[in-house]
């Protein structure tokens, strides 16, 4: 069972409306919210679930990483796409590529803040999905806190996070950038025009944390990756 026969063990993620299963699949849960002081603490009377199966496709990011890699190494990069377009799959493979290195690139120390368990799918401290040989993972940790923890404990060259959603995430990444760490992250938007209408992105541009933007689109049934300066 996903809960390990213990509702208490999954109470934190369940209160946020999802569960993470072994192997990386994610289960969205709907039901009646149990509120305390305006904060959801649990779900009862479960009415439906939605299973999202994680896919790992090795090698899809290799041409992209080669294109982005420059004389100073890998630049801080933001991945942009609407939900379901493959941001997390691409991000995970980029983490692998950067962590493992290649014949033309050195391996990098990569720190991953896997707040929702979708990147590494940790199970009892072991990644169920490949994230590279030189990767440290903080599982179930809020991004803003996790970035600071990695800076203190893991000596990363690159820090990767999935789905920037809050301003405190930006401030933590600004701290990392000021420490000389490269950043790799995703954000929801269909295109750059939509992104510029988001107040969070305006703040992100002001901080000048990211150098490159990768836009993911689906054209004729195939995913296309386009890069541009940010």
Where are these regions (language model features)?
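Hydrophobic positions on the alpha1 helix immediately C-terminal to the Walker A/P-loop
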Residues: 90, 94
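Conserved lysine of the Walker
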Residues: 87
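P-loop NTPase switch/communication element
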Residues: 99-148
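Conserved P-loop NTPase nucleotide-binding/switch module
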Residues: 154-213, 218
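P-loop NTP-binding catalytic core
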Residues: 7-74
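The conserved Walker
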Residues: 83-84
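Hydrophobic anchor at the beta1->P-loop junction of P-loop NTPases
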Residues: 77-79
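C-terminal lobe/lid and adjacent interdomain/linker elements of RecA-like ASCE P-loop ATPase modules
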Residues: 123-126, 131-139, 187, 197-230
């Amino acid at each position: 069972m996903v809960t390990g026969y213990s509702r208490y063990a999954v109470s934190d993620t369940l209160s946020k409306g999802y569960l993470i299963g072994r192997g990386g699949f994610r289960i969205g849960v709907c039901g009646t919210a149990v509120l305390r002081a305006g904060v959801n603490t649990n779900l009862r009377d479960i009415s439906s679930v939605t299973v999202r199966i994680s896919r790992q496709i090795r090698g899809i990011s290799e041409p992209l990483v080669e294109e982005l890699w420059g004389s100073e190494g890998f630049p801080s990069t933001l991945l942009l796409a609407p939900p379901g377009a493959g941001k997390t799959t691409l991000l995970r493979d980029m983490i692998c590529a950067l962590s493992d290195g290649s014949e033309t690139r050195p391996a990098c120390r990569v720190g991953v803040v896997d707040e929702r368990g979708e990147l590494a799918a940790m199970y009892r401290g072991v990644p169920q999905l490949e994230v590279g040989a030189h990767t440290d993972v903080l599982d179930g940790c809020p991004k803003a806190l996790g970035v600071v923890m990695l800076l203190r404990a893991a000596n990363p060259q690159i820090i990767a996070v999935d789905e920037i959603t809050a301003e405190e995430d930006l401030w933590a990444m600004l701290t990392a950038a000021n420490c000389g760490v490269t950043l790799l992250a995703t954000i929801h938007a269909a295109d750059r025009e939509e992104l510029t209408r988001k107040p969070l992105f305006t703040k992100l541009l002001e901080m000048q944390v990211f150098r490159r933007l990768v836009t993911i689109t689906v054209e004729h049934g195939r995913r296309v990756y386009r890069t541009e300066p940010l």
